[in-house]
Curated annotation (Swiss-Prot):
Keywords: Cytoplasm, Glycolysis, Lyase, Magnesium, Metal-binding, Secreted. Belongs to the enolase family. The gene is eno. Its main location: cytoplasm. It comes from Haemophilus influenzae (strain PittEE). Its EC number is 4.2.1.11. Pathway: Carbohydrate degradation; glycolysis; pyruvate from D-glyceraldehyde 3-phosphate: step 4/5. The lineage of its organism: Bacteria, Pseudomonadati, Pseudomonadota, Gammaproteobacteria, Pasteurellales. The active site is at E209, K343. Catalyzes the reversible conversion of 2-phosphoglycerate (2-PG) into phosphoenolpyruvate (PEP). It is essential for the degradation of carbohydrates via glycolysis. It is an enzyme of class 4 (lyase). CDD domains: enolase. This is Enolase.
Length: 436
């Protein structure tokens, strides 16, 4: 038995200068797990609650001392003495103790930090790397794959202080044979994009996720700049590198008139018009994945978009599904989208996250493992991507150490598996729904 002997919570700082929750779980034998909860900027309305103090005299109300107190008191008292290797039981104890549908009593930030720290401690007690332990929890021990990165190299929307409406313009180095090669391609395109933007007299300041955040006349201009950068780097767009976008449509959807109002471009669209706007972009550029291409509540619009684009474009639900199996199940039954973005702080525990990934895969949906815009040096999502063989990861651009920490962990994992004589496959474009 890997007995829990101590649980510690503390307030630390994330990549945006805001507090977040970090937890330590200590086991008999001296094994320790340490994990921190991430935080989002553009959030779905049905996400599990991130508990903030609201005390304007500290961190502009964004302190997390209440959540930390829950870790140090109620949660610690409930799980000390339990077996850390019973992950589902540990998570369920915290969920039941919280007693709310959206974890608003303790906060998903408190529960998740402990959940992940517990998994890390349990993995250490079994002498396993975290990705291998996650594979065991997932019922797929020894089955790994390295994820195809979706690299956010131009930031807009809520992730940047510019006039670009679409939140993320991403590249996928699909021509790579290994994760390490994919990162090299991504870095070379990123540096060439800096040259392209400088030559146009544009800003090379970066947004929350490490991508550039220039003012551009249109979303098509962002794609044109990326195309130029890919070619300058010596690669072929559509062969070596494909494109992906996160529209974060809920951020520019006007619920009062039902219009998608892209203020940066000075254009407004109905739901169906916006789908056809995106369809035109996919005809001009090799865009193989679109995330949140409709407002989270516009299920009729999503159904139409899936009908129009779903046979050839990966349509990822982020705000749409919020890593929630109840919502995902309904979406699967109604034929909404064909992929889910996985953010474990949207649901608040490792066990529930694994359940969402399994449900998606069983239904033929892909699962894209994702960071949040507010991150720390915690690289757990790298292990999650490999341990569940998810196939794709979204963890930012080629700058900011909070993003690079995840890529570096993936490098370590890929190398470790190769050294062990059990290299993990890198799926490339085959990982993307509709592209196999």
């Amino acid at each position: 038995m890997a007995k829990i002997v101590k649980v510690i919570g503390r307030e630390i700082i994330d990549s945006r200068g805001n507090p977040t929750v970090e937890a330590e779980v200590h086991l008999e034998g001296g094994f320790v797990g340490l994990a921190a909860a991430p935080s989002g900027a553009s959030t779905g309305s049905r996400e599990a609650l991130e508990l903030r103090d609201g005390d304007k005299s500290r961190f502009l109300g964004k302190g997390v001392l209440k959540a930390v107190a829950a870790v140090n008191n109620e949660i610690a008292q409930a799980i000390v003495g339990k077996d850390a290797t019973n992950q589902a039981e540990i998570d369920q104890i915290m969920i039941d103790l919280d007693g709310t549908e959206n974890k608003s009593n303790f906060g998903a930030n408190a529960i998740l930090a402990v959940s992940l720290a517990n998994a890390k401690a349990a993995a250490a007690s079994k002498g396993l790397p975290l990705y291998a332990y996650i594979a065991e929890l997932n019922g797929s021990a020894g089955v790994y794959s390295m994820p195809l990165p979706m690299m956010n190299i131009i930031n807009g929307g809520e992730h940047a202080d510019n006039n670009v409406d679409i939140q993320e313009f991403m590249i996928q180095p699909v021509g790579a044979k290994t994760l390490r090669e994919a990162l090299r391609i991504g870095a070379e395109v990123f540096h060439n994009l800096a040259k392209v933007l400088k030559a146009k007299g544009m800003s090379t300041a970066v947004g929350d996720e490490g991508g550039f955040a220039p003012n551009l006349a249109s979303n098509a201009d962002a794609l044109a700049c990326i195309k130029e950068a890919v070619e300058k780097a010596g690669y072929v767009l559509g062969k070596d590198v494909t494109l992906a976008m996160d529209c974060a449509s809920s951020e520019f959807y006007n619920k009062e008139n039902g219009m998608y109002e892209m203020k940066g471009e000075g254009k407004s669209f109905t739901s169906q018009e916006f789908t056809h706007y995106l369809e035109e972009l996919t005809k001009q550029y090799p865009i193989v994945s679109i995330e949140d291409g409709q407002d989270e509540s516009d299920w009729e619009g999503f159904a139409y978009q899936t009908k129009v684009l779903g046979d050839r474009v990966q349509l990822v639900g982020d705000d749409l599904f919020v890593t929630n199996t109840k919502i995902l199940k309904e979406g699967i039954e109604k034929g909404i989208a064909n992929s889910i973005l996985i953010k474990f702080n949207q649901i608040g525990s490792l066990t529930e996250t694994l359940a969402a990934i399994k449900m998606a895969k069983d239904a033929g949906y892909t699962a894209v493992i994702s960071h949040r815009s507010g991150e720390t040096e915690d690289a757990t999502i790298a292990d999650l991507a490999v341990g569940t063989a998810a196939g794709q990861i979204k963890t930012g651009s080629m700058s900011r150490s909070d993003r690079i920490a995840k890529y570096n962990q993936l490098i370590r994992i890929e190398e470790a598996l190769e050294r062990a004589g059990t290299p993990a496959a890198f799926p490339g474009l085959k990982a993307v729904k509709g592209q196999a």
